[in-house]
Structures are given as structure tokens and as C-alpha cells.
């Protein structure tokens, strides 16, 4: 069977018996034994799969090694492994073993593993039945997500840092493993940043670019699940920055001269410019700093991966601008024309974009990297209105989760709130949204925020901004929109119909 199957996919039998496949099979065996000692694959449960790394074969076309089903994971041998083609077809089956061993069977997780390979270009996938991965889904039987923030091991999860909120989708268990395929697929689609999916009362699927990434993340996820369980036992909330007491129901009073009502507010989303921070700080301090230092920044960091990515993003934006006839856009030469020419064109485009106050991701990412240097060197200190720090602390202590939504990059937002004249305010903020989630003047962006937060009723989210068009978009998405009136803000249309505040103390 193995010879025929190998021939069908254009591989010689010798390859299936070669070094790469043998080493991968041995590694899967070794990891299964290790994870058995962790309690992740006991009682024949759980499973591991891994791509056969071969630099001569593109990753999507590499063979796959999968552990068998119903086998004592701590006693497995390399010859017990199944070998699959890149599309999931079995091309090598292990030989049967004498009684009391069961006939060989590929893991029931195979269809779910294939989804991680196909949809996330994974290099390895781990399915754990660790007790903490089961219990964490029971803390709130109605929850569709697991959330945790401000915990050290979050940094071990791809794309996350200490201040980020880690969100893992939870899907409902079924009687048979392969029946989870559709719900796992939907979860992977709905949570593009996630590298894991929890199955209620069952376990967790975790993937990574390689076996090292998958293993590292699995260890971090289990640590975080355990931390959340222990915090819950202490009556503390893992999803808030200071892990304060769990609050089951939160009610706040909104009062003004026109109405008074009780509103179960749990989420507040804040704009920055003209809402938490004076417009003049952005226009008179941040923008000039970026404009004056862009050339210096590009010269010093030109060969770094980060700056090369910034150049790539800006070049793509400029090409689009040139097609649309945007004023100030000039072509950015290819790298082989020399560093100096590339930087000169970059500077010219950045200056034009800043003058036009363009709200585009390519510019905002580069600005964030320039501002990072300014904050690190104490050349910049962020300014917030005097009522902001007290309000953030009050909302946080009340169990209300505060998020930021700004056209500035997430990095720039974190730098600003981490370096204010009132100290580091990030401890009061649960997360940050930027234009990668959508344009602030489009209602679908606010719908995406609602889905990301896992909120059923959008009216439970209050959005505060100084921009009328943003308030209109948020309201169209069902959010409670309030307009911030601050010194220097643009005038509002007459009869705009929105509640306004001049201070966060009025919220």
C-alpha cells in the first residue's frame, strides 16, 4: 500500500523510509511521551501531528506525520506513525501489533488537524486533553471565548505581548471528534489571530509554524489556562488588567438634563485625538516629530526586517496612490537602485501624507516605529486630558473593560498610554484597535469590534469620539455613541442628535 500510494504522489518509496520522515516520526514519539507526563495525552487521548520538514519541498506540499488513535501515547514507537500526503491522504500505515494491541487506526483528529494545516499553514498541531484546558471552559458555561490579559506567558503566544488581551474561541463538544470539523473551521475563520481553539469539556487544539512554536505555545496556553482557573478560585478576574474581583453584574448611571436610565455597560471604546488627548499634541508634537525624524529613522534601521516591511507597505500604498492620482505621491524606487534613492522617495511621500493627515495603515505603522524611538529616548511625553486617568481607573475598578480605537497603529497607541504625563495608563486598558479592523467612518468596523469582543448586544458598547462621522458609523452598527467636546475640536453639525460630554467625569 505504501509503495503504491507513494508512487501516486510522485515520491519514491525510499523517501518514505528516508531520514526526514524517520526523524519526524521519532520526534512525534518523543513529544507524545513528554506530553504524557504533563497529563495532556493520557488514557490514549490527545494527539500530535507534524509536517516533515524538507527545505527542498514547499511547506504546503510537505508530507505529514500523525500519531495513531487508541494507543498508549507513552509507549508509542516511530514505526507506529501514519504518513499522510499534503492533502491528507494516508500513504503509509503502521503494521498491526499482537494482542492486546488494537488494529492500527489513524487519529480521529485528522480532519481537524488538516484544517489547521490548510487554513493557517501550520507546521505542527497538538491536541491536548489537559485538565486545565477542560476546566477553563467550564468557568462560564455560556462563554464563547476564553480571555486573559496582563499575564507574563501571553508573550509566548504568536502576535501577543504582555499588555494584549489573549482571546481563544470556545466551541461545543460532540460525541465524535470528527464532528467538530465544521465548528473548528468557523472558529479559525472568525479568529484570524488565534493559534488555538478550545473544545468545551474536552480539550484544546493548538498549532504553530513549526513543532517548536506549537510546543512553546502549548506550554504557554496551559500555563494561562491554569492561571485563569486559580484566579477564578480566588474570586479574581483574569480578563481585566489588574485581575480585580470578579463582578457578575455591572450597572452604571448615565445622567443628563434630558434623561436618566440604568444601563448595563460593560465595554467602553475610546478614540484618542480630541477625546483622550488634545488635538494639538498630535498635530503640533507627534506629526512634526515623525516628519522631522523619518529620514534619520530610515537611515539607522534600513536593513532591519521591521523597516523593510514598512517600506514594502508604503510602496504598495504609493503605487495605489499613483494609479488614483493622489497629490504628492512619488514612485519609490526598487531596492537595487540604492538605499539613498529609496529613503529620499520615502521621506517625500511621508511628508505629503502627514500634510494631508492620511489615515492609512502604511503611514501609521511607520510613524509608530519613529515615535517609539522618541518615547524610549524621553524626547516625547504623551499628554492626556486631566479627567482621563481618573476615569480610566474608576471604570476599571468597576469592572468595565476599556478599549482604544484609533487610526494610529496599535504600537503607537500603546506608546502613548504607556508614557503619559499621568504615568503608565495601559494597566486600565484591555485592548487596542487600529485601522486593520476597518475605517473608523464605516459601520462595518464597529460590527467587527463587536464580534471581536464577543458582545451579543452592541448597545452594551459605548463609543466616545470627537468625530461626527465616526459617531454616525458606530450608531449605525448599534453602539451607544457619545461625542467628546474638547478644546480645539471641530464644530459639530446643528441638530446632530448625539449626547455630548466635555469631560469623562460626565460618563
Curated annotation (Swiss-Prot):
Positions with a binding annotation for substrate 1: 109
A cellular-component GO term for this protein: cytosol
Organism taxonomic ancestry: Eukaryota, Viridiplantae, Streptophyta, Embryophyta, Tracheophyta
Gene3D superfamilies for the chain: 1.10.720.60, Class II aldolase/adducin N-terminal domain, HAD superfamily/HAD-like
Residues that hold Mg(2+) according to the record: 271, 273, 466
Region (Enolase-phosphatase E1): 268-507
InterPro entries attached to this UniProt entry: Aldolase_II/adducin_N, Aldolase_II/adducin_N_sf, Enolase-ppase_E1, HAD-like_sf, HAD-SF_hydro_IA, HAD_sf, MethylthioRu-1-P_deHdtase_MtnB, MtnB_viridiplantae
Similarity comment: In the N-terminal section; belongs to the aldolase class II family. MtnB subfamily. In the C-terminal section; belongs to the HAD-like hydrolase superfamily. MasA/MtnC family.
SMART domains named among the record's database cross-references: Aldolase_II
Name assigned to this protein: Probable bifunctional methylthioribulose-1-phosphate dehydratase/enolase-phosphatase E1
Modified residues (N-acetylalanine): 2
Source superkingdom: Eukaryota
Organism annotation: Arabidopsis thaliana
SS bond partners: none
Catalytic function, reaction form: 5-(methylsulfanyl)-D-ribulose 1-phosphate = 5-methylsulfanyl-2,3-dioxopentyl phosphate + H2O; 5-methylsulfanyl-2,3-dioxopentyl phosphate + H2O = 1,2-dihydroxy-5-(methylsulfanyl)pent-1-en-3-one + phosphate
NCBIfam families, alphabetized: enolase-ppase, HAD-SF-IA-v1, salvage_mtnB
